[in-house]
Amino acid sequence: MSANPSARMILAHCGSNTGPEDVKPLFEKYPNFFCDLSERSVPKIPAKAFVHKPEKMVFGPDGIVSGWKDLIEEMPDRFLVGSDVYDGAKYAKAIKVIRKGLLGNLSPETVEKVAYKNAIKLFGLQ
């Protein structure tokens, strides 16, 4: 990104094993750096997996991990919602977890950005 500062980069799965303390410096250094929040919650990752690797979870059915919530609210222009669910049977559950666990725990302004406005802006959609 240093070689091409105007390039945009979306970190898939927000890095998978990263914490907010890993991502924030990248946001501060690179204005065109973004994270998608897919594959960091159930049902994409089975709940039992988070027992052994709790750092993988950003949000779940009951809310957002505190450090992540703080960063998403602080820098809402840098996050995009995602599911990565390819199994139709799990899609409805994934959307429910996103709506209740993620979007249901953010301010209305942040919800709009994370849910759709950031994607519209980033991808030039109208």
Tell me what each language-model feature is.
Residues 1-80:
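Catalytic pocket-lining loop regions of alpha/beta-barrel enzymes
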Residues 41-42, 85-87:
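Short histidine/acidic/glycine/proline-rich micro-motifs that form metal-
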Residues 66, 70, 74-80, 86-126:
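Mid-to-C-terminal alpha-helical segments outside catalytic/metal-binding sites
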